[in-house]
């Protein structure tokens, strides 16, 4: 059964916690991780890109010169795709890129992402994380104490506004509540800092 050290906000180890084998001890499945990350990034796309075809570009209603007798190539409009300023052929138009993968695949990917942090020794469990107010300096100090200053995903059991506001101005740091935990953010941050309560919440949902 995998284990993780438990720290206080001063960076001192105060114990050890046993992690669920069914959640944190699964083999890493790279193919599933890739599938879910691609889906998440696709779902973030706005899809508002647009180009104009020859029928949408302004102008070009008049034939530029007569069909025969000039010695020049025949043209019917200055908005043809082969003209500068003409329409675009097969260009992008607004579309919805979002799609879904099966729920079981998402759960498996989340377990794999958690396993990568356990295998790399990059999971730090906090006994508690309470801040008196939104203080970026205090959050930076806590991360420095935990030797996670280069970037971390901070996960709490419930939404913690003080933690959220304290973390959002720090580069490479993001705060989530347990129910928002996702594959992309886990893989995109070097460290996972998670409270003991959040571990229980994640295990309850994924076990």
UniProtKB/Swiss-Prot annotation:
Keywords: Ribonucleoprotein, Ribosomal protein, RNA-binding, rRNA-binding. Residues 44-77 are annotated as: Disordered. GO terms for cellular component: ribonucleoprotein complex; ribosome. Residues 47-59 have a biased composition (Basic and acidic residues). It holds the Pfam family Ribosomal_L4. InterPro entries: Ribosomal_uL4, Ribosomal_uL4-like, Ribosomal_uL4_dom_sf. One of its GO terms (molecular function) is rRNA binding. One of its GO terms (biological process) is translation. Residues 60-77 have a biased composition (Basic residues). Transmembrane segments: none annotated. Part of the 50S ribosomal subunit. Belongs to the universal ribosomal protein uL4 family. NCBIfam families: rplD_bact (TIGR03953). One of the primary rRNA binding proteins, this protein initially binds near the 5'-end of the 23S rRNA. It is important during the early stages of 50S assembly. It makes multiple contacts with different domains of the 23S rRNA in the assembled 50S subunit and ribosome. This is Large ribosomal subunit protein uL4. It comes from Desulforudis audaxviator (strain MP104C). The lineage of its organism: Bacteria, Bacillati, Bacillota, Clostridia, Thermoanaerobacterales. The gene is rplD.
């Amino acid at each position: 059964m995998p284990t993780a050290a438990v720290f206080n906000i001063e960076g001192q180890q105060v114990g050890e916690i046993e992690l669920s084998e069914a959640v944190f001890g699964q083999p890493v499945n790279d193919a599933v991780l890739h599938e879910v990350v691609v889906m998440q990034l696709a779902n973030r796309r706005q899809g508002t890109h647009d180009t104009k075809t020859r029928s949408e570009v302004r102008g070009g209603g008049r034939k530029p010169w007569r069909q025969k007798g000039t010695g020049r190539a025949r043209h019917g409009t200055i908005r043809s795709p082969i003209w500068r300023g003409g329409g675009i052929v097969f260009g992008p138009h607004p579309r919805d890129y979002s799609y879904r993968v099966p729920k079981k695949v998402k759960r498996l990917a989340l377990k794999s992402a958690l396993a990568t942090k356990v295998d790399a020794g990059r999971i730090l469990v906090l006994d508690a994380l309470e801040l008196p107010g939104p203080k970026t300096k205090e959050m930076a100090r806590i991360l420095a104490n935990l030797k996670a200053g280069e970037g971390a995903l901070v996960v709490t059991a419930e939404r913690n506004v003080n933690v959220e506001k304290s973390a959002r101005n720090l580069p490479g740091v993001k705060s989530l509540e347990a129910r928002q935990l996702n594959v992309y953010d886990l893989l995109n941050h070097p460290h996972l800092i998670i409270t003991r309560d959040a571990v229980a919440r994640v295990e309850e949902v994924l076990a």
